[in-house]
């Protein structure tokens, strides 16, 4: 059950990866429309510069204005066991069908459900527009539920054989037919139950606003501590992209109000108190540096060059784009205690910042959120808040360094560089020498690359049931865990870490994990095709 939840959480990250670039475009465009940055002349409505900026900004809003649709279409990429493209098409058609059913039922029987479909779909009305359809505002929750349901139907019925005379309805068409019938009761139940859910969401929003600093600490702590399980997606998702604290999610709300916030002289915490729930990126920007410095200075002097080669790219990835797993997994499996301390420090840093008036959209890294969506557009009227944030962040960088260094030395933790064999885990040549591999045996891995090495380490194509990925991890369901090789082999091939649970394995690869997954799937297809050809030749 847990592996299925983790798989679902990982699939949610596929559409999430579209937001950083969109956020950068919107943030820069709003900054260029601000007369305090570019002058009154360039921001005049009849200015060619202003018109071009407006056109570009509208393109940047694509992802934000179509979040439910994007989440619905994006999930099957990670959840469908085969023919992911066809699954996405089936989900798209079914999701639109569901919304059309909601619209028709609401317009016809709105009085029965207690929903006024004649109202304009404005904020607070409970209604919204999706692909030109007036429907209930179920945010990304409805999209995720419907997408998951239709993908399950795809996994079950895509291969179902039909009689020859019904062959035209086989495959995706049959999935859409089954889903069409399923969407009728789904729409009915949505109209019946969602208005009550909306009341519950409003109560949750009020509670979280009143929770203040305590709510921020608990939220940030859970978001960090659950990273090894992959369940952290279910913590931040409802806040950043869903309606947990504001309608439409913190990401969209901040982008929509960025212009007004940047031109207001009121404190940002007064304007946007909910912004405390989007401070989890501070541990990525400031905490990562302290962790990396502690790991470097506790390594043996003769190993520090090698350790630096491991830590510098991982730390830059965390700081610039907010992906922390390559760094965190260098010490997570060596000492879970360090990771727990990391979660406590991250939550405490965000809480201290919030108490001192720091709010905003700081969930990512410097390049995607800190600079374009916060510091640059807010500098004119809110520079003091930024200096407070940076000051607190640097203090916590030092605190991270002291705490991690003390724990590593006092507990004699074998972090990278404190034991010779640990460094060799990150060097393929060293590992092969230690294992006594011959050059001939190692050559295929070198030739076929990392994916081929992972395939062998996983026990071959026959030992893999399904492959999925999130931002940095391969998530693989296996036939037999005993056929896999040791974690050392995966690390020698470039993995940052390995998580094993039952017959499921997670290989922490890095930001190039989508390419590795595609290569793995192609290698598996080639392997199965070769086996089929061999069997055919044997029979003939």
From Swiss-Prot:
Bilayer topology term: Multi-pass membrane protein
Gene Ontology, cellular component aspect: plasma membrane
Keyword Transferase: yes
Name of the top EC class for this enzyme: transferase
Active-site residues, as the UniProt record annotates them: 470 (phosphocysteine intermediate)
Domain notes: The EIIC domain forms the PTS system translocation channel and contains the specific substrate-binding site.
Identification of the protein by name: PTS system alpha-glucoside-specific EIICB component
Organism: Klebsiella pneumoniae
Lineage of producing organism: Bacteria, Pseudomonadati, Pseudomonadota, Gammaproteobacteria, Enterobacterales
């Amino acid at each position: 059950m847990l592996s299925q939840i983790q798989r679902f959480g990982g699939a949610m990250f596929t559409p999430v990866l579209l937001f950083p670039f969109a956020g950068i475009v919107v943030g820069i465009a709003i900054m260029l429309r601000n007369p305090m940055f570019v002058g009154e002349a360039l921001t005049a409505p009849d200015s060619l510069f202003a018109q071009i900026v407006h056109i570009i900004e509208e393109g940047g809003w694509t992802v934000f204005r179509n979040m439910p649709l994007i989440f619905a279409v994006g999930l099957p990429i990670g959840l469908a066991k085969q023919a992911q493209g066809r699954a996405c098409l089936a989900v798209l058609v079914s999701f639109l069908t569901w919304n059309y059913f909601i619209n028709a039922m609401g317009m016809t029987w709105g009085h029965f459900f207690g929903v006024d479909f004649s109202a304009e779909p404005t904020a607070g009305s409970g209604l919204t527009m999706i692909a030109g359809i007036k429907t209930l505002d179920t945010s990304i929750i409805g999209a995720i539920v419907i997408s998951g349901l239709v993908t399950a139907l795809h996994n079950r019925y895509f291969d179902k054989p039909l009689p020859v005379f019904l062959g035209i309805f086989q495959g995706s068409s049959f999935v859409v037919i089954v889903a069409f019938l399923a969407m009728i009761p789904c729409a009915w139940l949505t109209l019946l139950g969602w208005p009550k859910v909306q009341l519950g969401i409003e109560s949750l929003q009020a509670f979280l606003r009143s929770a203040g600093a305590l709510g921020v600490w608990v939220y940030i702590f859970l978001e960090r501590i659950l990273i090894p399980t992959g369940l952290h997606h279910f913590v931040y998702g409802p806040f950043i992209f869903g309606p947990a604290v504001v309608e439409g999610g913190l990401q969209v709300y901040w982008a929509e109000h960025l212009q007004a916030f940047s031109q207001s002289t009121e404190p940002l915490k007064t304007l946007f108190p909910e912004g405390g729930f989007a401070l989890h990126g501070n541990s990525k920007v400031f905490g990562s540096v302290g962790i990396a410095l502690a790991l470097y200075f506790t390594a043996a002097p003769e190993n520090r060059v090698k350790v630096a080669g491991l830590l510098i790219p991982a730390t830059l990835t965390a700081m610039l784009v907010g992906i922390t797993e390559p760094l965190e997994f260098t010490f997570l499996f060596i000492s879970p205690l360090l990771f727990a301390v990391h979660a406590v420090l991250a939550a405490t840093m965000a809480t201290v910042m919030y108490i001192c008036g720091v709010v905003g959209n700081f969930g990512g890294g410097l390049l995607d959120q800190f600079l374009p969506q916060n510091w640059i557009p807010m500098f004119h009227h809110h520079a003091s808040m930024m200096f407070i944030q940076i000051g607190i962040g640097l203090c916590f960088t030092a605190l991270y360094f002291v705490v991690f260094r003390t724990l590593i030395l006092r507990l004699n933790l074998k972090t990278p560089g404190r034991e010779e064999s640990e460094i060799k885990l990150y060097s393929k040549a060293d590992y092969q020498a230690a294992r006594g591999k011959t050059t001939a045996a190692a050559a295929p891995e070198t030739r076929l690359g990392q994916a081929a090495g992972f395939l062998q380490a996983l026990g071959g194509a026959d030992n893999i049931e399904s492959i999925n990925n999130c931002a940095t991890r391969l998530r693989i369901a296996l036939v037999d865990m005993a056929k896999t090789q040791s974690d050392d082999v995966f690390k020698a091939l470039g993995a940052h870490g390995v998580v094993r649970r039952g017959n499921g394995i997670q290989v922490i690869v890095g930001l190039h994990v989508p390419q590795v997954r595609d290569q793995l799937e192609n290698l598996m297809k080639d392997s199965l095709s070769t086996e089929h050809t061999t069997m055919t030749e044997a029979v003939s």
